[in-house]
């Protein structure tokens, strides 16, 4: 079968070339964006007198018919059509005749694919913002019920200081807020229309790029046609943003895996979002967070793949750039389902408050509070207080106690200047609520953080 570009060729493309060269098996994902762009283009061509109104109406009606056929499963895909643009144009021409051949006036596949792909990425930015907002709201809802639930705050996966479970969850809410802001920033930066750039240098036809930009929901046309058809930084941005988001998801997933183990027992994942073993009847495996952790590597790979594709390309379009889409489609689809299932996993898990609070009674979590007491009440330098507290911890270890369980007499054996008021400093709830500096774990600060994040989500929705 001859191609639409076959005029200068003396032989048909080989079947092997069709198999190697065609992007249709994956870029048919862009059918909706391709049709949207073509409708806007035809509308503009008619307004500019390049097409007659009758031709434009025939084209638009035909494109809507093609869309219905695709969505009803009646469209016949043929790899010889090469890509989604040619597949739709051929179907349109077969449907309405010669008017269909005029649609490509003042347009190249170079700006056409840049448009389709950008529309897809922009919609994906909006979808991911919505799903991240849902996840943030779930974290906030859980946090509201646990502003006083103690867990060990850790560094190096070792017990460090007492914090609230709410505070821990809000740390992830803060990360996901920044993820939302990255998607927002990318959307705003890339909300410019490629259509009308043609092959690389614009077109001599009297087109109206401002009109098509407005029709398609863009802020304005892109400023330089050569750049527009040559670069895929908008695709790299969403890949980077997804990779960063997955890094945050992976860290939360790792903690869910740890917390759901017998060794921690902080949470119990619901049966709906757990799996079993084919040989060990007792097993209840945290497959959801494990898969989320695994998919993070895949998101990183897609980012590095496109960076590598783009790094040495001369201007303008090169066929290498056909390799831009599959990784983006893959990352976007994985990101969407990952956000949905993580959200449901969090909503349905059981929180074992008693296990969390029991874990705070080991590991000497109030050691820093003792050092602070020595500085505040006795007036010694912090480094000296640090040393004395270390001696107290060593004594507690020797007596197989937690630091908070040492008696006043035992503490005074380390330093006789310690008085009875030290005991409140060693109380876990007091320790947590004493950290009332801005951004701290005290209940007052956590409630302010909840209010801050809820206000952010309200403004996002508005």
From Swiss-Prot:
Record-listed E.C. numbers: 4.3.2.1
MF term (GO), any: argininosuccinate lyase activity
Keyword Amino-acid biosynthesis: yes
One of the GO biological process terms: L-arginine biosynthetic process
Pathway this chain belongs to: Amino-acid biosynthesis; L-arginine biosynthesis; L-arginine from L-ornithine and carbamoyl phosphate: step 3/3
Pfam families: ASL_C2 (PF14698), Lyase_1 (PF00206)
Protein name: Argininosuccinate lyase
